[in-house]
Each structure stands twice: as structure tokens, then as C-alpha cells.
Regions:
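N-terminal type II signal-anchor transmembrane helix
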Residues: 1-60
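Extracytoplasmic/periplasmic proteins that interact with beta-lactams or build/remodel peptidoglycan
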Residues: 36, 48-58, 63, 127-135, ...
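Peptidoglycan glycan-strand catalytic modules in the bacterial/periplasmic cell-wall system
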Residues: 55-58, 62-257, 369, 458-462, ...
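Residue-level preference for non-acidic, small/hydrophobic
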Residues: 66, 93, 136, 182, ...
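Short pre-catalytic segments that frame enzyme active sites
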Residues: 67-78, 201-205, 230-234, 308-314, ...
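Bacterial peptidoglycan biogenesis and beta-lactam-recognition machinery
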Residues: 95-108, 122-126, 173-179, 191-196, ...
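A penicillin-recognizing enzyme superfamily signal
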Residues: 316, 320-342, 349-351, 364-367, ...
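Ligand-recognition elements built from short beta-strands and adjacent flexible loops
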Residues: 670-773, 777, 786-788
Length: 788
């Protein structure tokens, strides 16, 4: 009775098999109904994806010289061509997984029927029937196509629709690819355990060799693992792995790929695997001190349309702009001044290469180690390239100076330097005993009562710049800070109350902005220096030199165009004004400690309560801004030598931050490249130049020209000394700062002739005589020295 039942089951199974094969291998036509439609959808072959798609691989992140510093992947796979795979591996696969591989057309009908009969008679699954083609399809849908857990389960579910689809696609695959191509794709795709995907990664993992170098026993072991990579792991189950290897060797001998004597000899050999599997560290977390740059590069690419998910799958080569020699110099400089183990305080440094069409980041470091262990002074927070700390302090005075230069001030313009400054409508608080509604600031040191803008940049009196920002306007200073490089100051909620820092500073008419009281992005601050070194031209800080895909094709990166942030002459003038900082300014001592003699432009900065400090410096070949700040859970004043948290701070930008810059600069080839040539126009100021420009003009033209530039003009007639009547001989401002609305007196010739040798004036010259303007050289000789 049981024999009859088995025979009946067999006949039914064969009938079902015939129907299934007919459905999956023949086009579905004329079979209406929802069920058939669903079956057709399930079976539909995505042949283009199978034959042209790329399996996930390993993305390599390198420094500018191509040396790897990190690998990014989900599946560690290295696709190799057929000739780079040992023939023994192909033979082992065919002899063990699909002996009729070269005879069938993707679906082995004989094997299918044989397995079906065996399983029915056994009352369970005793024999499989999947060909190499079918296994490839299943693994591809699981390892490549599946985008989530649900799709992964669908790719491996035990269901008739899934099996039919698999058979249909396997048949199509055989019509499209050669047998060798199918074997190559299969061996490049499947998992071999221990995080190795594909035969090349497997050969490296277990034997530290290439797939081309595998001998019969090694190939047999790897193919044997495919039965169950977990159960047959040779590191946890060497006996099981050895037994399975020997089964594969005997299969190879049975199919004639190797001699039986060779199979027996290899079967008696030890596994020969490495003492431990050779794996590959994954992610920026393994990049050590280069981790910050690696992480920034990935964020940068994500912003440009190449997300991390794609990078993890794409087998890209990402070449960064990081220069290892400059990076090492930066690390040494930072950690020589701020210990990685010091609680609550860190120093960050980015070194940016100036340029008018690109802005490469050559180094990005923190005094902290990159990592996850807080007990080991590690962090993965984006300290070098995000808004951190309590501000760059007086470094922000360069923005006020730049705004003043734009508005016509010159480096020689004289500015008041009161001991205490009280301004209204520009915030409140500040120095002690400040009246309600006023913002008060005092100078820490003793200064001359008046000094030039150039000297003010070097000596850094607070009161001078608070009064200067009152004259230039806070909005213009904020805007120029953003244009020069502090672009994150326009990010929504960067101020913390829903507003950007830039908007809050403008809304509150923040006089303290010139003293740098807000968190700063150290990368952007370094880029400000690079912008000034590059003729006032802003370019986005760039961590990427090149990206190619696994086929070596260039990947386009949509970078923003560079912008002219300020006039090149203003940038050069500001650089000239900042050059005195290391000569007789706040960075003089630091330059002396470093024995630094090359010209640079520099500005030190310290917040009012010494909670952070910075040093911005640049030459034509290097730009950087070391930044020291509280990075713990508690913000306190900071002390110097050594840098640490303390109750009463004494840290200044001319201390460790400046020391860091000079020490790092010795490792940067372009650091001694000098400064741009400065124009004399901005030494005196464009407003002063505007006054000089009307000398020699007639009264009406001169008056109109100055009024158009915002001056209030009055006229006085003076002794002509040979100038034609009605001709301007000088222009005298009432306010040496030449602010908007300044009263200017035009001194106009009365036509008197020059003094005769007897001391008597000569007869007046006719106003009808043609007056010839002096040459620029003669005009320069005739000018009186300016007190502005």
C-alpha cells in the first residue's frame, strides 16, 4: 500500500514539475486571472541587472599620494576577471555544485527530476537541484538587489513563485552569458565566510594570496565552505572543513579534473590556512589620526550627491587632498601644545592651500585621538569642521577692518583708542558698571590714545574696534565675515534660537561681534585666511582630489564656483596690515620662540573670559587657524602652559595657538611664500584717494564728485599760488575717519599768481587759461602727509 502511495505521489509530483517548468520556461500567454498575473510578475527576469549590474565592493579612501587610509564597505569583495581565478576553483565548483553545468541550459531538467524523485521517495529533502545558474540568481537577488530585510527574505524564501522566477532567470542567463562568464560571476559574488565575499577576498582571508594562486586543496576548501559558511568555518570547525574539502577533492577526481592520486595526496595535507583570518578594517573609525579627514570627505561627498550607502556598495577609489607629511606636521604641532589626555580642552587645526580656483585641505587634525573610547581621550565628533567652542576672539577684528577698508578707510587712518568705550544700541553688558542699555568694553593693556588701523590690527585694542564697528555698521561686518568664509553662520538655528548666527548678530546690532564671541568652525576660519591669501577670492574647502568608480571612470562632483568675496586690493591691503602682528604685535613673542622670520599675515584672538583662543595666519602658500576651546561637558576659563581648564584664565591667542601655527608651518612647503603686493591706495584709503582725485578740478565738478560719494561739501576761496581761479587746490575733511556725511572743505584758488622774488603776489591768472592736471607723480609730490 505504501509503495502504491509513493508511486501516486511520484506521478503527481512529476505532473506538477512538468507544469511548473512549462510555466517558468515558456512565455505566459493567454492565461488570464490575478494568480497568473502575479506569477508572471514574480517570474519576470531582470536580465539587464543580472548581466550588467555590479556587486557591492570595497571603496578605498586614500591620501593625495594614493596611500589607503580607510576602506568603506558592507561586503568585502574584489571582483577579478576570469584569468585571475584559478582553474582549480572553477573545476571544484562545477564538480561539486553542478556536474552537468556544461550540458544544461541553466536549468538541469534531469537533475530536477532526479532530485524530485529522490525527495518524494525519501519523504523529505535528500537532494538539491539548483544549478550554478540558479544559485547565482538567488545569491544576486539576495546580496545585490535586496535593499532591505523584507527583500532579502523574499530572495531566499521557500516558495513556488520564487523558485519559478529563479529558474526562468537562470535559463535567460544561460542564453546571454558564456559558461565561463557565469562561473566567474558566481565566484566573484558568493560569501565564503569570515566577511569574505568573492573568491579573491576569500583567497586573501584564508591564505593571504590571490585567487589565481590557489592550488587544488585550497580551491577545494573554499568551494566546500559554500555548503555552510558558518557550520564549516575552518577556524571553529577544522575537522568539518577538512572533511568537506576532501569531498570536493574526490569530486574533482571523479569528474576527471585532477588525478585520484593527487586528490588523495591533497586530502592528507593540513588545511594550511592562516593562523587567523586576514580581514580588512572597515570605516573611518580605523583611520587613526586621519579619521577626521576621512569622515569629512564622506560627508562632503554625501552633500554632493554620493551618499554613504552608495559608497559602501560602489567600490570607488576616493583620493583625498590630505598630504601625509603636512598632516603629520599638524598632528605634532597640535599635540605638542595641547595634550590629548587633558580633560575638557582640545585644539583643532586645518591647513588649507590658497588658490583662486580650488581650496585643497592638506591637513585636518585634533589634539584628541579619533575613536570611540572616551576613557582613552578619543572622539569622533566633527571638532575640526563644525561650530564649536566660545569664539575666535579678536581674530574677528579682521572682518571689521575689511569692512572699513571697503568703506574707504585706509591702513593709515587714525582711530581713537579710549581706555573704556560705552556704545548704545549695540547690545548690553560687557565691562563692569555698564549703564542700562549700553554695551561697554575696556582694554586690558595700555595703549596710545590714537593709532592707525594697521597698528590697531597688530596691538588689538578692543575699544578701537568696537567704535569702528559702530561706524562701519554691524551688518556690513557680518556680511563680509560670511563672504570671506564663515558660511555656516547663515545656517538656520546656528545661533540656537531658530536664527542663524549672522541674522542674530544683525538683529541685535551686536557690537561684540568684532570681538568674536560666537562659536566658530575652525575649517571655515582657516579658509578665511586662504581667501585673503588668494586675492579675496572664496572657494569651498575641498577634501577631494579625485573619485573613480570600479571601472576607473571619473565620478563628477558638483562643486560650487569660486566667488570674489572682496576686492583683491583690499585683500592685499588687509594682509599688509596684518603683517605687523609678528613684528611688533600680539604674535611677536610667538614668532620669536619659533625663530620665524618669513613674512606672514596674522591675527591673534582670545575671548573675553579666556574660554577659547585662536591664531589666524597665512602666506601665499599656506593658510591655517589653530583653535583651542572647551570640549567637555563643562565650560571654564582656560590657562596656559600647560593648556588646561582653570578658575581664572590666562590663555591668549599669542600663546599655544600661535605656537601651533609656527610649528606646523615648518612642515608646509609654501609657508614662506610671502604676501601679496599691496596698493598704496588702501594705505591712505579710497576716501582719502577720492579727496586727492579732485585736486586740479574746477569747483563745480569737484563738488559734484564728492557729494556723489556721500561727503558734505563746503567751499572756501584761498590764495591760488598760480592755480587758475575756481580750481581746487586742496580738500580738507573735518573728520579724519572720512565716515559717511563727513564735511569736506574745498579750497578753491582765487586766481592769484605765484609769489614773486620780491615777495609780492603776481597778477591773477585768467580763469580762461587752460589748466592742465598734474601727472600722478607730480600730484603725489604735491600732497601733504596724511594724519589719517
Amino acid at each position: 500500500m505504501s509503495a502504491l502511495r509513493s508511486l501516486g505521489n511520484l506521478l503527481l509530483a512529476l505532473l506538477a514539475a512538468a507544469l511548473a517548468v512549462a510555466l517558468c520556461l515558456a512565455p505566459v500567454a493567454g492565461l488570464g486571472g490575478v494568480a497568473i498575473a502575479r506569477a508572471d510578475e514574480t517570474m519576470r527576469s531582470n536580465l539587464s541587472d543580472l548581466t550588467h549590474g555590479d556587486a557591492p565592493g570595497v571603496t578605498t579612501v586614500t591620501d593625495v599620494h594614493g596611500t589607503p587610509m580607510a576602506w568603506i564597505f558592507n561586503q568585502r569583495r574584489y571582483e577579478v576577471p576570469s584569468e585571475a581565478i584559478s582553474q582549480y576553483a572553477k573545476d571544484a565548483l562545477v564538480s561539486t555544485e553542478d556536474r552537468r553545468f556544461y550540458d544544461h541550459e541553466g536549468v538541469d531538467m534531469q537533475g530536477f527530476a532526479r532530485a524530485l524523485v529522490t525527495n518524494v521517495l525519501a519523504g523529505g529533502v535528500e537532494q538539491g537541484a539548483s544549478t550554478i545558474n540558479q544559485q547565482y540568481v538567488k545569491n544576486y537577488l539576495w546580496l545585490v538587489d535586496a535593499q532591505n530585510e523584507e527583500q532579502a527574505q523574499a530572495a531566499t524564501e521557500q516558495s513556488i513563485p520564487r523558485k519559478l522566477r529563479e529558474m526562468r532567470m537562470a535559463s535567460d542567463l544561460d542564453k546571454t552569458l558564456s559558461k565561463d562568464e557565469i562561473l566567474t560571476r558566481y565566484l566573484n559574488l558568493v560569501s565564503f565566510g569570515n566577511h569574505a565575499f568573492g573568491i579573491e577576498a576569500a583567497a586573501q582571508t584564508y591564505y593571504d594570496k590571490t585567487a589565481a594562486e590557489l592550488n587544488p586543496a585550497e580551491a577545494a576548501l573554499l568551494v566546500g565552505l559554500l555548503q555552510s559558511v558558518e557550520a564549516l568555518n575552518p577556524y571553529t570547525n577544522p575537522d568539518g572543513a577538512t572533511h568537506r574539502r576532501n569531498v570536493v577533492l574526490n569530486n574533482m577526481a571523479a569528474e576527471g579534473y585532477i588525478a585520484q592520486t593527487d586528490a588523495d595526496r591533497w586530502a592528507g595535507a593540513p588545511l594550511g590556512i592562516l593562523e587567523r583570518p586576514k580581514t580588512l578594517p572597515e570605516g573611518c573609525i580605523t583611520a587613526g589620526d586621519n579619521g577626521f579627514m576621512c569622515d569629512y570627505a564622506l560627508h562632503y561627498l554625501a552633500d554632493k550627491g554620493l551618499p554613504l550607502e552608495e559608497i559602501e556598495r560602489g567600490a570607488y577609489t576616493i583620493t583625498t587632498t590630505l598630504d601625509p607629511a603636512i598632516q603629520n606636521a599638524a598632528i605634532s604641532a597640535v599635540r605638542s601644545n595641547v595634550s590629548p589626555e587633558t580633560a575638557g580642552v582640545a585644539e583643532v587645526l586645518n591647513i588649507v592651500k590658497p588658490g583662486t580656483d580650488s581650496r585643497d585641505i592638506q591637513a585636518m587634525v585634533s589634539s584628541r585621538y579619533y575613536g570611540l573610547d572616551l576613557d582613552q581621550s578619543q572622539t569622533i565628533l566633527p571638532q575640526p569642521y563644525s561650530l564649536v567652542g566660545n569664539g575666535a576672539g579678536s581674530v574677528f577684528k579682521i572682518f571689521t577692518a575689511a569692512a572699513a577698508l571697503e568703506q574707504g578707510y585706509g591702513l593709515n587712518t587714525m582711530l581713537e583708542t579710549p581706555t573704556r568705550s560705552v556704545v548704545y544700541g549695540m547690545g548690553d553688558g560687557g565691562a563692569a558698571n555698564c549703564p542700562p542699555g549700553a554695551y561697554c568694553v575696556e582694554n586690558a593693556g595700555v595703549y596710545a590714545p590714537r593709532m592707525t588701523l594697521e597698528d590697531a590690527l597688530a596691538q588689538s585694542p578692543n575699544t578701537t574696534f568696537v567704535e569702528l564697528i559702530q561706524q562701519t555698521g554691524v551688518a556690513s561686518v557680518v556680511d563680509i565675515a560670511v563672504r570671506l568664509g564663515l558660511r555656516s553662520y547663515t545656517d538656520p538655528d546656528s545661533f540656537g534660537d531658530g536664527r542663524s548666527i549672522a541674522q542674530a548678530a544683525k538683529d541685535e546690532n551686536m557690537g561684540a561681534f568684532t570681538l568674536g564671541p560666537t562659536a566658530v568652525n575652525a575649517l571655515e576660519l582657516s579658509n578665511v585666511a586662504a581667501t585673503l591669501a588668494s586675492g579675496g577670492r572664496w572657494c569651498e574647502p575641498n577634501p577631494i582630489a579625485n573619485v573613480t568608480d570600479e571601472h576607473g571612470r571619473q565620478v563628477y562632483i558638483d562643486r560650487p564656483a569660486c566667488e570674489q568675496a572682496i576686492d583683491p586690493q583690499i585683500a592685499a591691503a588687509l594682509a599688509a596690515g596684518m603683517s605687523k602682528d609678528i613684528i611688533d604685535g600680539t604674535a611677536k613673542d610667538a614668532a620669536g620662540r619659533a625663530n620665524w622670520t618669513a613674512p606672514i599675515a596674522a591675527k591673534t584672538g582670545t575671548t573675553e573670559s579666556h574660554q577659547s583662543s585662536a591664531f589666524l595666519g597665512f602666506s601665499l602658500g599656506m593658510a591655517a587657524a589653530p583653535y583651542i576651546f572647551n570640549d567637555g561637558t563643562q565650560t571654564t576659563p582656560l590657562c596656559t602652559r600647560p593648556v588646561r581648564q582653570c578658575a581664572a584664565g590666562d590663555l591668549f591667542g599669542g600663546n599655544e595657538a600661535a605656537d601651533t601655527w609656527f610649528r606646523a608651518a615648518y612642515g608646509v612647503p609654501g609657508s614662506t611664500a610671502g604676501l601679496p603686493e599691496s596698493s598704496s591706495v588702501y594705505q591712505r584709503g579710497t576716501k582719502r584717494a577720492a579727496l586727492d582725485a579732485v585736486i586740479g578740478l574746477n569747483q563745480a565738478t569737484a563738488k559734484s564728485q564728492l557729494e556723489a560719494q556721500g561727503f558734505t561739501v563746503t567751499v572756501a576761496t584761498v590764495f591760488g599760488n598760480g592755480a587758475p581761479a575756481g580750481t581746487v587746490v586742496s580738500a580738507a575733511p573735518a573728520d579724519q575717519n572720512l565716515s559717511a556725511g563727513t564735511l569736506v572743505t574745498l579750497n578753491v584758488s582765487d586766481g592769484s599768481g605765484p609769489i614773486s622774488p620780491t615777495g609780492a603776489p603776481t597778477a591773477p591768472l585768467s580763469p580762461c587759461l587752460l589748466y592742465t592736471s598734474p601727472s600722478p607723480r607730480d600730484r603725489q609730490k604735491s600732497r601733504m602727509p596724511s594724519s589719517a
